[in-house]
Amino acid sequence: MSGHSKWNNIKRKKEKADGAKAKIFTKIGRELAVAVKQGGGPDPNSNSKLKELIAKAKAANVPNDNIERIIKKAAGEGEADNYESITYEGYGPSGVAVIVETLTDNRNRTAGEVRHYFDKFGGNLGTSGCVSFMFQQKGVLIVEKEDLDEDKVMEDCLEAGAADFQADEDVFEIYTEPSDFSGVLEDLTAKGYEFVSAEVEMVPDTYTSLPDEDTAVKMQKLLDALEDNDDVQNVWHNWENPDND
C-alpha cells in the first residue's frame, strides 16, 4: 500500500474540512446518531461502530459536549431511524476506482445526484462490487511525528496489536485489522497518543496516476462534488495526486 498517498489524501480532506467545519460536524453527527439507533445503543463499550465513530469525531475536533449530546439525543426518538446506509461504486476519469458511502433518507435522490456527478466529470457509476475488490478495509490511525521516537512508537503499536506501521515525512501511519481497531486505539490512547485521523477506511491495494492536468482537474471536481453532498459520508479512491506530494 502507498502510505504516502494515504496521508496526502487525509491532508487534503482535513484542509478542506477546516473551511467547512459545520458541514463536517453535521455529517459525523448523523453517523453517530445512526450508529446509536441502528448499531446497538448509546454505550460504546457494547457498540463497536459507535466507538469507531467517536474516535473519528474526536480526530476531526468535534467537541466532546457535541458528541455526548448527539448520542444522548439519538438514544431517544429521532430522525436517525429514517436513514439507510448505501454504498456506490464507480470509475472516475481514466478508470480511477471510487467508492462512495452515503447515509440517506431518500435513496432515489442520492442515487440520482451521485450518478450525475460521475457523468458530469468524466466517470461512470458502476455496479456493486465493480471496484471494491481493489480495496481492503483497514483501521487507519495517523499520529503527527512531532518529537516522538520512531522506534518507541513502532514498539507501542506492535504491542497494541497493529498490523502495519509506516513512517511518512510528517506522520506515523498505523494500520490495523478492522476487528482490532478499537483495541489498538484504546491502548495507544491510554499511552498518551493523539490522532490526526482515526477511522476504519477502505484502503486501495495500489494507487493510479492520471495522464494529464485536464483529467486531474476533472477527478478533483468529482471528488469535491461528492464530498460536498450532504448525503455522502465518505469517499474512497485510488488516485495518487502528485499535487499533494
Regions found by a protein language model. Name each.
Residues 140-245:
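Positively charged, low-complexity, intrinsically disordered RNA-binding extensions
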